[in-house]
Amino acid sequence: MTVPATDSCPAPIRVPAGTTAAAAVRDAGLPGRGAPDAVVVVRDASGTLRDLSWVPDTDAEVVPVAANTDEGRSVIRHSAAHVLAQAVQELFPQAKLGIGPPITDGFYYDFDVPEPFTPEDLDKLEKRMRQIVKEGQLFSRRVYESKEQARAELAGEPYKLELVDDKSGDPDIMEVGGDELTAYDNLNPRTRERVWGDLCRGPHIPTTRHIPAFKLTRSSAAYWRGDQNNASLQRIYGTAWESQEALDDHLRLIEEAQRRDHRKLGSELDLFSFPDEIGSGLAVFHPRGGVVRRELEEYSRRKHIEAGYEFVNTPHITKAQLFHTSGHLDWYADGMFPPMHLDAEYDDDGTVRKPGQDYYLKPMNCPMHTLIYRSRGRSYRELPLRLFEFGTVYRYEKSGVVHGLTRARGFTMDDSHIFCTREQLHGELASLLRFVLELLGDYGLTDFYLELSTKDPDKFVGSDEVWEQATTSLADVAAESGLELVPDPGGAAFYGPKISVQARDALGRSWQMSTIQVDFNFPERFELEYTASDGTRQRPVMIHRALFGSIERFFGILTEHYAGAFPAWLAPVQAVGIPVADEHVPYLESVAAQLKSYGVRVEVDASDDRMAKKIVHHTAQKVPFMLLAGDRDVAAGAVSFRFGDRTQINGVPRDSAVDAIVKWIADRENSVPSAELVKVSSGE
């Protein structure tokens, strides 16, 4: 949960040769320790972040980096991870150090310890960390003269020894990188004696007192460097901020996020579950969840038909050769389920009469859509051809990264593949992006930015020229949208660059939603052609597009965005009748029948519970419209509206109530209904 960072770009300052960056910051009158915008590091002309103790050999112009910026927070969190590691090794001397990087909104550190950490251990560690912070220990950078010196010093730290020779470029490995091998020592501020140290490339804040606010949040198991074949370590997570106020805001957001967790709400609202008997990452939707999912799909299906898409269906498994042709088995095999060897025939003595072949669960729909295109000759008059499918795919996600509906192993993509001419590409991309943004907006997501993922130089197919053309087309369309564009170097799939539409939810969290990917490679691999207007055979361009990402993921995101209180048009139960007493049930059933005639999903609660308990229950179930009826309502042919925010409208004529509910649903209002928003005339 991200508390907004300061985006202002401070003016550069000059650091004279032979003086520290800290002195230049002080002379410039910039904020120091204690202020939320205190300068914690500087960025030099090459873009490298430098400690405030850095002394340039020649005059240097640097940009101050404040604590309340993304970069400043990252430095604070990295330093907090060091303080955590120091506390762990003081309280648990047998602990061996793994890695401890800053991450979004926090930090973690991995440790090899005999027993998992307990909540009581975290309390003790946090207490010791506060003491270290209060001591004001200095972070002091030291350069190793050689790798041999580093190895000798780190002889008791096997995981650090492994990192001395690391050349992976993994951004989570803060220990090494750059031209030098360095350590950061924590020094006693009075004696300058080394208290603790760690292999690290930095940078760091000047002293531990520059960590104004932090908290340890949890611990878990984690494989060394994320590989399940490696040792299992214990990971401690924490968060650190530039002020206590920012930390408190963050913790409130975490608490709210936990309240909105779709896995929790899925159980409470009886929407979906993950039975152990089926397997990790494989969801089943219950009747109420099935209603929401159906409404999500049906509205999307209607909008796609209006936009000129043609619906197709493809099987869940296919022969291995298809994924050899597409390149998936060359580049994506680790993300696929193991093959099934089928079709072999044997003689009675076991001799193979006909060899079998491998089949795979499909991880993507695109190869099959190319076969639909290729099934007959195509003319330029048919292009653009927009194929669309709710296609279920299967990906072998590691168990440690599976997370409810938002990271599953089996899911249904709202998958489209568009085949067009090169001349049509720009217009098709522009209209496609507009379509994506409008449709997501219809579901209540309106705060967007774009991410442009470009070629991974070590993992791509096709020529540089083709990649450049595709990337330029996407960049131009992104610029025309007027939305913020964030670069993602090396983030593209192996077959083409892409634009990702990122949406911010009600808590300000960013979610990757739609992807739009240009692909010149698949048409080559599958030898796709069309007859051009001059009679020549030409290659089409292929555009991959998943608007929701997957139905399951979008379901999970919307569940959290709305905290389970889905808009009435999506809600599994749109209205419920709550009688004051049993004798009022028949009247409410007649109101319900009237609503059902308009297609409203309505129930009447005829249980033995008291009315107050029924209201509490249906409020917890997030039913948008509760209709109450007692003697006066029945006599007047009216109902009383009750809403989730506890507001109420009494004595509404039943026809007016029905009209109001039907209109609210038909208009696809995404706000939560209340006495203030629902326009009806009260009979009182």
UniProtKB/Swiss-Prot annotation:
This protein's major location comes to cytoplasm
Documented EC number(s): 6.1.1.3
Q: Which UniProt keywords apply?
A: Aminoacyl-tRNA synthetase, ATP-binding, Cytoplasm, Ligase, Metal-binding, Nucleotide-binding, Protein biosynthesis, RNA-binding, tRNA-binding, Zinc
Protein residues bound to Zn(2+):
C366, H417, H544
Stretches the record annotates as Catalytic: 261-567
Q: What GO molecular function annotation could you give as one example from this UniProt entry?
A: ATP binding
Q: Name the InterPro entries on file.
A: aa-tRNA-synt_IIb, aa-tRNA-synth_II, aa-tRNA-synth_II/BPL/LPL, Anticodon-bd, Anticodon-bd_dom_sf, TGS, Thr-tRNA-ligase_IIa, Thr/Ala-tRNA-synth_IIc_edit
Q: Name one Pfam family in it.
A: tRNA-synt_2b
Tell me the GO BP annotations in alphabetical order.
Answer: threonyl-tRNA aminoacylation
Q: Which cofactor does it need?
A: Zn(2+)
Q: Which cellular compartments is it found in?
A: Cytoplasm
Q: Which domain of life is it from?
A: Bacteria
Give the co-factor note.
Binds 1 zinc ion per subunit.
A GO cellular component annotation here is:
cytoplasm
As its record notes, the protein acts as a catalyst of:
tRNA(Thr) + L-threonine + ATP = L-threonyl-tRNA(Thr) + AMP + diphosphate + H(+)
Q: Where is the TGS domain?
A: 1-66
**What does the subunit comment say?**
Homodimer.
Q: What does the function comment of this entry state?
A: Catalyzes the attachment of threonine to tRNA(Thr) in a two-step reaction: L-threonine is first activated by ATP to form Thr-AMP and then transferred to the acceptor end of tRNA(Thr). Also edits incorrectly charged L-seryl-tRNA(Thr).
The entry assigns this protein to a family as follows: Belongs to the class-II aminoacyl-tRNA synthetase family.
Q: What is this protein called?
A: Threonine--tRNA ligase
